[in-house]
């Protein structure tokens, strides 16, 4: 298939393929792009590429739908058995929504480190390797983030 033929095929059918995939997945553009890449990678294009694309898009979109369902079930089960991070009946009166809003107010680089350490369980060395930088910089940003959160939430350190 030549580049011009592929371009015409995309111009004529990409929108309809995206609409077709949307009934099964929240990422229809990704599914269509993957199908087009499969078409390009074929040694010899199919005799009728449009029906072939619809078949590939349908299968990929349904696979994505099944994966999303499995992921949602898994995440729901994990969340049900996870310890509660915020106790609405605690003396502090701290609730998840308030804490989330305060966390959202942190600079992106600081929030990333706080979340990675507290909820991800990563060490400062691991965080440094992930975000690029030193462990001491990750630690300083973590401390700054926790200090800012305590200030916004009116929570004092028990020590």
Language model regions located:
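Base-recognition residues in the alpha-helical recognition helix of bacterial helix-turn-helix
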Residues: 19, 23, 37, 41, ...
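A short, charge-rich alpha-helical start-of-domain segment used by transcription regulators
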Residues: 1-29, 40, 44, 111
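Hydrophobic recognition helices of helix-based DNA-binding modules
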Residues: 17, 21, 39, 43, ...
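Structural recognition of an alpha-helix C-terminal capping motif at a helix-to-coil junction
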Residues: 30-37, 47-59
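DNA-recognition helix of helix-turn-helix
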Residues: 58, 62, 125, 131-157
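Arg/Lys-rich amphipathic alpha helix in sigma70-family domain 2
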Residues: 58-80, 86, 92
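Amphipathic alpha-helical segment used for protein-protein interaction
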Residues: 12, 83-116, 120-130, 140, ...
